[in-house]
Amino acid sequence: MKPILLQGHERSITQIKYNREGDLLFTVAKDPIVNVWYSVNGERLGTYMGHTGAVWCVDADWDTKHVLTGSADNSCRLWDCETGKQLALLKTNSAVRTCGFDFGGNIIMFSTDKQMGYQCFVSFFDLRDPSQIDSNEPYMRIPCNDSKITSAVWGPLGECIIAGHEGGELNQYSAKSGEVLVNVKEHSRQINDIQLSRDMTMFVTASKDNTAKLFDSTTLEHQKTFRTERPVNSAALSPNYDHVVLGGGQEAMDVTTTSTRIGKFEARFFHLAFEEEFGRVKGHFGPINSVAFHPDGKSYSSGGEDGYVRIHYFDPQYFEFEFEA
C-alpha cells in the first residue's frame, strides 16, 4: 500500500475532509492556506487564500459548490469552490473551532472558542438571507457556559447539531430552538473529533482519554468502545465495511522527547462490532491529527503533525479480509 504524499502545508494539519463524491480532498492546517486536491492522484487543484491565521476546520456542501472554513484569525469564511473566490466573511470575537453546512447547504453553523474573556458560542446563519451575512447577525446563537465545544457536526436531517466538549460531554442542540435535546458524558477528557457514518445513523468520537466510542446519532446511546494507549485525535467510519480507523499519538508538546516507535504514530483499524484491532498503517512522523475515509470506502487519508497528508489506497487483500470472530 504505497501512499500518495500531499505536500501543501508548512504547519501541522488540523483537518482533512472529502466532498460527498470523494473526488476532492480539502485540507487545512495551522498555516493560513486552505488546499483542495484531486483525491485520485494527489494533484493540487488550488488554494483558497484570505485567512491570516491557523485554520481549524473546513467543510464542503452537498453539491460541492461552496466551501466553509473557520480560523484562529477570528473569522469564518465562505468560498466558491470552483473559482476560489471569497463569498462571505463572518467576523467573530474568538477563534472558530468547528464549522459545517447542513444538507441543503443553506444553513451553516460554527462554534467559537472560549478565550480572551469571550464566551463559547454556536452560531447559525441562513445563507439565503443576505442581511444576516451583511450585518454579521446569526438567526440563532447558543451560548455554552460550561466547557467549550471542541468538535461539532450536523445531526441527521439537519434537525440538530451534535457537539463534543472539552470536558468529555456530548450535547445534542436543536437547530430550531437551540435547546439541549440530549446530554451524555461517556468520555472523561476532551472530545477531539466527531464523524458520522455514511447513513448518519451513528457517529464515532475520538477523545483525549485514549478511546474512540460509537454512539447512536438520535439518542446518543453509547454502543462500542475502541481502546488505545494514546490520545485519539481523530476517528472515521468506513462507508461499506464494519471498520473504524483511529489516528492519534501523544501530545504535541511531548513529541520531541520520544522515538517514533514509542510514539505510536500509526493509523489503527478496528472492527466495529468486535472492538478488536486488526491492522495498522505506519507513515507519519508525529501524531496523526485527522483521518477520513473516501466515500467509496476504497481508500482513506490521514493528516499529521508533520504537515503531510497521505492518501492510502487499500490493497486487494483488504477487501477479501474476513474477520474471524
Curated annotation (Swiss-Prot):
Q: Which Pfam families match?
A: EIF3I
GO MF assignments: RNA binding; translation initiation factor activity
Residues bearing N6-acetyllysine are K264
What PROSITE patterns does the entry give? WD_REPEATS_1, WD_REPEATS_2, WD_REPEATS_REGION
Keyword Magnesium assigned to the entry: answer is no
**In terms of one coarse class, where is the protein primarily found?**
cytoplasm
**SMART domains, A to Z:** WD40
Q: Where are the WD repeats?
A: 8-47, 50-91, 144-183, 186-225, 283-324
Q: Name any GO cellular component annotation.
A: eukaryotic 43S preinitiation complex
What keywords are assigned to this protein? Acetylation, Cytoplasm, Initiation factor, Isopeptide bond, Phosphoprotein, Protein biosynthesis, Repeat, Ubl conjugation, WD repeat
HAMAP family cross-referenced by the UniProt entry: eIF3i
Q: Which family does it belong to?
A: Belongs to the eIF-3 subunit I family.
Q: What is this protein called?
A: Eukaryotic translation initiation factor 3 subunit I
Taxonomic placement: Eukaryota, Metazoa, Chordata, Craniata, Vertebrata
